[in-house]
Amino acid sequence: MIQRIQTVYLLLIVALGITLIFMPVLQFVTPEEAEELRIYELGASGLTLITNEDCQPEVCLQGLWGLLLTTALIPALALVDIFLYRKRLLQARLKIFLALLCLGYYGVLAIYIWQAKLALGVEWHLIPWASIPLICFVLTLMATRRILKDEALVRAADRIR
């Protein structure tokens, strides 16, 4: 199981996905013409106001269930997929779903950006953590390719016998 390179790719997806759960991916900043500078951060745990009078982070909005569910499913599916090493075709199908989920994360994120922009009237900026689903997508494609190569190798070995 661990000797296969796709397992390493899957473990990286799990580690990056767990990191994504706890890190903010967007910053919302009030426009320059506003009377007060306010900086919000958006992550899977919610929308947090970073700059306020007490300089203490304050959670403004919880219940971003779509973003939290998408973020939690990425490492969960990758972890389940590690233990399906004997069922390579099922593993490849799950990888395709995982790749779509990684791209779907950006769709869900776009919905929350649009809602926050309308509700708060702020400008948004991506934080480097926002690239994690894209990295997971690339790792998923690499793992899928290796899984399909393994399946072809096993079928070729069965024909030789």
Language model segments and positions:
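Membrane-interface helix-boundary signature
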Residues: I2-Y9, C60-L67, R88-A92, V122-W129
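N-terminal signal-anchor transmembrane alpha helix
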Residues: R4-V29
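Long, glycine/tryptophan/cysteine-rich extracytoplasmic
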Residues: F22-C60
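Individual transmembrane alpha-helix segments
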Residues: T51-R88
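Select subsegments of transmembrane alpha-helices in polytopic membrane proteins
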Residues: W65-T70, I96-G104
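Cytoplasmic juxtamembrane regions at transmembrane-helix boundaries
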Residues: L77-C102, R161
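Alpha-helical transmembrane segments of multi-pass integral membrane proteins
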Residues: G104-R161
